[in-house]
Amino acid sequence: TQEQRSLPANCIVFPPIFRSSGELVFKGLFCFSPLFYFFKKLISEKAYTSLYKFKKYIATAITCRCILADKNFKRLNRQSTESTVYFYWGIGMAYILPFIHNKDKKIVRFHRTDLYADLRPHQYIPFRKEVFESLNKAVFISKQGLEYAKKNFGQYKFSAYCSYLGTKDHGISKIKNEDGVIHILSCSNVVPVKRVSLILKSLLLIPDRPIQWTHIGGGKGFNALQQQLQQLPANLTVHLTGAITNREVIGHYLHHPVDIFVNVSASEGLPVSIMEAISFNIPVIATNVGGTNEIVTSESGVLLDPHFSAQELADQIVRVYEHKDRFHPRRLWEEKFNAGKNYPRFISQILND
């Protein structure tokens, strides 16, 4: 991303360990990082049983060896025991956890695809056992994720709790809907799991209402979605923005009317896109998957069955629009998903526990 964020005075950001896949492979192969460990895990994980698993394992091993050989990593790993190591994802950099020594706290936050192996190809996540054996605190973005971990990884000795993510307070848009049009917004990658085309299918079942649907996000299915817009009824206007920056997303909320936010994904963790929507006091219609029911309640919107029909979504769009004054989404955001409250609380918790 080209967006830059300000840093506190006591924060140091190291340069990337590698800047290209070629540099990664070279550094991962031609270094003095341990080899025997990775050969042993290749056998114990049976990563040789399929081509996908083998390729995934080799790529992961090369990445780990590249990181372990980095001079900045080595320096950090030698620092005092009174240190806290925090990984934002349970995959990727977290794979080096077994090699981090003399640290007081090793903390990993888990989301969705880094937690649920059944969402990964061949249900395979490398070094799963080693990551859970090495951490001493696991943080989950949803209560649903926390319960999943307790059930599936309860044999490992670590403390666990749920700490919601959050979004910044940008206020509430002063743009009012005065044109009688139902303004629908959705925001996701256009990929199969997000089922964006089902939104269009549902909107076509509301012929007697003027509707403007804006979808924010690109992806592999973007061109195919565009093709479906060739012949739209007169009452329906569709705007596909493609991929845009988060600043532009916030700008859309601030400068355009939005009546309903829609998310019909087949699988979710706990969507930040919904957090943003309810922060602007916009009611949500979303599928009851993952931890979505922790943010879409009777106060903030309506939940759909994961296997909803297009007609069901169409009916709910009309109902929520006609009764949107009954919803108070921002109240829920203030209580549970305000970054200004959640992140200081999280930092205090991980430092003081």
Where are these regions (language model features)?
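Donor nucleotide-sugar binding/catalytic pocket of nucleotide-sugar-dependent glycosyltransferases
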Residues: V108-H111, R128-I172
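Nucleotide-activated donor-binding/catalytic signature segment of Leloir-type glycosyltransferases, i.e.
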Residues: Q226-H252
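A charged, aromatic-enriched C-terminal amphipathic alpha-helix characteristic of glycosyltransferases
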Residues: G171, E248, F308, E322-N352
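Aromatic "clamp/platform" in nucleotide-sugar-dependent glycosyltransferases that forms part
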Residues: A266
